[in-house]
């Protein structure tokens, strides 16, 4: 396929929009940003905060550590966002918080000055923060995208408002007339200088991986597996290096490390999963700079392409689809053939389809390790001319039809699963 300049620009712009640095899990960070913007307009520290979030944002914010705080949950996200957040920081809103600000945030929580509840909203991704101080109050709403401020109100006066397309209405999609082969062709033929920016993903996520290997964050799965090599319980082979280095980055990410991840489709874990396997394999095969750049771009673009067929947040764990992106990048590094990519992604769909998202938490790193392991296993099968075929399950003989089947299940059939997961999570007894 020959790409017109307008389409080329649109594809690159989409990647630049979806692959951005993010400090901390993006759902609680979205609420922190709403609170930071509200604080900017309030002009003073709040006495109390009322926050409302969509059910999916509640799911993804309940169990994850807010970076730089050592504390889990949306109450901390709202508090530290209001006290120390940078309203212009986007997904790095908490980059410059101090220990003193964290202490103030914890005091507000202990004094029961913060309330977070579920909003009855049409938006899958929605956060609202209302800050109160003496006789003043400011309300800020974010919807559809993690940093998309749609409403600002102060003391009952509307200061800013813009329409927000509901996700299900599907605004124009740059991928509407593209398929997986087009994604492959574009990544290999676009001018190198136009996609060189993707190298930053390797830099940021590699630093996060090293942090996860140096300290015990979250479940410290990557670090634990690394130790087992020294004990002779697992081998120091390419599969385990992929799993260890990718999972370590997720450990650090979910465990509150004060380092940004390069995200993909609004998720740090998806960005990590689309990046680190490519970095590890590129190092293993001594890939040149251009090979690494194109493999990274192919990985991230394929991940975005697949995710564009999904709701922004859903019951399907999206690191599984991000791993299909890195599957493309790694398969290209090892074979240079689209056929291997098609076979491997088909096998992944036959393997890990339907893994649920039960909220952002330290255990996300487990799903990351499972997904990248499936990816590499599927690539090895493709190298031996073996794959899950179109005669099995939801896999079809054509890769895009298989992808569409997976995304249809996530978009429609798993909606009830999502409601059930959220119901279970919000009704669990508090831990002692």
UniProtKB/Swiss-Prot annotation:
MF annotations from Gene Ontology: L-cysteine desulfhydrase activity
Coiled coil: none
Pfam families given in the database record: SDH_alpha (PF03313)
Any one GO biological process: L-cysteine catabolic process to pyruvate
Domain of life the protein comes from: Bacteria
Family note: Belongs to the UPF0597 family.
Name of protein: UPF0597 protein APL_1605
């Amino acid at each position: 396929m020959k790409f017109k300049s307008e389409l080329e620009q649109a594809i690159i712009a989409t990647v630049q929009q979806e692959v951005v640095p993010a400090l901390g899990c993006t759902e609680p960070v979205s609420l922190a940003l709403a609170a930071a913007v509200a604080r900017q307009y309030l002009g003073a520290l709040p006495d109390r905060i009322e926050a409302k979030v969509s059910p999916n944002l509640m799911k993804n914010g309940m169990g994850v550590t807010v970076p730089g705080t050592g504390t889990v949950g949306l109450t901390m996200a709202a508090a530290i966002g209001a006290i120390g957040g940078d309203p212009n920081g986007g997904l790095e809103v908490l980059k410059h918080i101090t220990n003193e600000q964290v202490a103030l945030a914890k005091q507000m929580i202990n004094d029961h000055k913060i309330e977070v509840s579920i909003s009855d909203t049409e938006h899958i991704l929605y956060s609202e923060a209302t800050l109160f101080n003496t006789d003043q109050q400011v309300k800020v709403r974010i919807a559809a995208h993690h940093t998309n401020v749609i409403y600002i109100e102060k003391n009952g006066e509307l200061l800013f408002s813009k329409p927000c397309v509901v996700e299900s209405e599907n605004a124009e999609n740059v991928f509407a007339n593209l398929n997986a082969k087009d994604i492959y062709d574009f990544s290999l033929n676009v001018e190198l200088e136009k996609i060189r920016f993707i190298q930053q993903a390797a830099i940021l996520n590699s630093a996060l991986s090293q942090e996860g290997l140096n300290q015990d964050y979250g479940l410290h799965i990557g670090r634990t597996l690394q130790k087992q090599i020294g004990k002779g319980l697992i081998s120091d082979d390419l599969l385990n290096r992929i799993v260890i280095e990718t999972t370590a980055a997720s450990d650090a990410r979910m465990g509150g490390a004060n380092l940004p991840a390069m995200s993909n489709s609004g998720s740090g874990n998806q960005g990590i999963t689309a990046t680190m396997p490519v970095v590890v394999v590129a190092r293993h095969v001594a890939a040149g700079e251009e090979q690494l750049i194109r493999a990274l771009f192919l990985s991230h673009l394929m991940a975005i392409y697949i995710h564009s067929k999904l709701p922004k947040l859903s019951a399907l764990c999206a690191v599984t689809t991000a791993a299909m992106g890195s599957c493309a990048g790694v398969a290209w590094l090892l074979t240079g053939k689209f056929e291997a990519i098609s076979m491997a992604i088909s096998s992944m769909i036959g393997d890990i389809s339907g893994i649920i998202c039960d909220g952002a938490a330290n255990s996300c790193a487990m799903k990351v390790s499972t997904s990248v392991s499936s990816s590499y296993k599927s690539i090895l099968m493709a190298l031996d001319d073996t794959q899950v075929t179109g005669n099995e399950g939801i896999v079809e003989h054509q890769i895009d039809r298989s992808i569409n089947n997976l995304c249809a299940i996530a978009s429609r059939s798993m909606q009830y699963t999502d409601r059930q997961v959220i119901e279970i999570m919000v009704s669990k007894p508090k831990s002692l």
